[in-house]
Regions:
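Carbohydrate-active catalytic/glycan-binding domains of CAZyme proteins
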Residues: 25-342
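Bacterial N-terminal signal peptides
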Residues: 9-21
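Twin-arginine (Tat) signal peptide motif
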Residues: 1-8
Length: 342
């Protein structure tokens, strides 16, 4: 029974981390992942740095840039720049939604303006094959008095059967004193519910990401006041949330944009491997990897054997089927690059 218990736990973890449609298999079959897709942006020195870049990996550790290192998607809407892209596989298993911050610091580096008078909208693309994408759309989600809508992410809520979309905003009601995490609900990423405050802390908070391990949700958030990443857990998306004791990275400073993904499911005699990546913005070093074999312990060690073709900035990772991996590789392999869609 022990191998079966481990296998069932492994299946639950993989399904919960955006693989549900990917891994509809019999319980007698060990789940397999055909590869991983990383969506990111490059920086803010040039307007084209703040667009959407793709990278592929077979093992979730060693990454290869697609499209000859050029952007795959470009936004000419709103502020004509996109940051912090988040890619989600929909529950139907056929649709992908890519949501991003509407912001270009390369065009305007005024921090006060970006916080007090920036975009209230998200830039959204959708696709059914990760190669052919819709035209981008700009959708206002933040409250009318918001000064920005940063680092959006989304997760399917099994209790309400819709998507919880969340982001960081400041608001005029407190003179833009601090960021809070706001949220709204949607079923189609076209129409959204009225926004509401999802995370309220004494300090400013940004860059929330949520991972499910098959038992509990784990929520990483950047405390913008002390410049540290925090970790909480909960049995449900709407809480209650409690801090994970002994989080080993709690004393790190200068990191943001946390993303956590399952590199390898557990198997008999071998624990799962999770990767937490943190954007080391303070040193302009891009993402730094850390690994854990049990999110509940809060223990992470520096990741070894990871390679990146350039400094990946705040982005996201999804697992792929073998067919999806091959399709992306064929469409954007060296010498077969495509003009960016917009």
């Amino acid at each position: 029974m022990e191998p079966l218990r481990i296998l069932l736990k492994s299946l639950a973890a993989v399904v919960a981390t955006s693989c549900a449609p990917l891994l509809a298999q019999t319980m007698a079959t060990k789940p397999t992942i055909g590869g991983f897709l990383f969506v990111t942006f490059k920086g803010q020195q040039d307007p084209m740095d703040e667009q959407i870049y793709f990278a592929l990996s077979k093992d979730g550790r060693n990454w290869t840039a697609l499209n000859d290192g050029k952007p795959v998607l470009v936004s000419e809407l709103g502020e004509k720049g996109v940051r912090d892209p988040y890619l989600l596989r929909a529950q139907d298993g056929k649709t992908f939604y890519l949501i991003a911050t509407d912001l270009s610091w390369a065009r305007d580096r005024s921090v006060p303006r970006s916080v007090r008078a920036g975009s209230r909208s998200l830039v959204i693309w959708e696709s059914t094959d990760l190669v052919h994408w819709s035209e981008p759309r700009l959708v206002a989600v933040a409250p009318p008095d918001a000064g920005c809508a940063w680092a959006p992410e989304a997760v399917y809520d099994v209790d309400t059967r819709d998507y919880l979309v969340f982001w960081a905003s400041t608001t005029k009601r407190d003179n833009f004193a601090k960021h809070r995490i706001w949220a709204a609900r949607t079923r189609d990423f076209k129409t959204f519910s009225a926004p509401f405050i999802y995370i309220e802390k004494p300090s400013a908070v940004i860059d929330t990401t949520i991972t499910y391990d098959g038992h509990r949700y784990y929520r990483f958030t950047k405390d913008e006041t002390v410049k540290a990443v925090t970790l909480e857990s909960s049995p449900k998306l709407m809480g209650p949330w409690t801090p994970v004791p002994n989080f080993s990275l709690a004393t790190l400073r200068g990191h943001e944009g946390p993303e956590c993904y399952l590199v390898e499911p557990a198997s008999p005699g071998k624990p799962a491997t999770w990767c937490l990546i943190l954007d080391y913005y303070a040193k302009n070093m891009g993402y730094q990897p850390f690994v854990s074999h049990d999110l509940a312990t809060g223990q992470f060690a520096p990741g070894e054997g990871f390679t990146f073709p350039f400094h990946f900035r705040h982005g996201s990772v999804i697992p792929l089927t073998s067919a999806e991996y091959q399709r992306l590789e064929a469409a954007y392999s060296p010498g077969n690059s495509a003009a960016p869609a917009n």
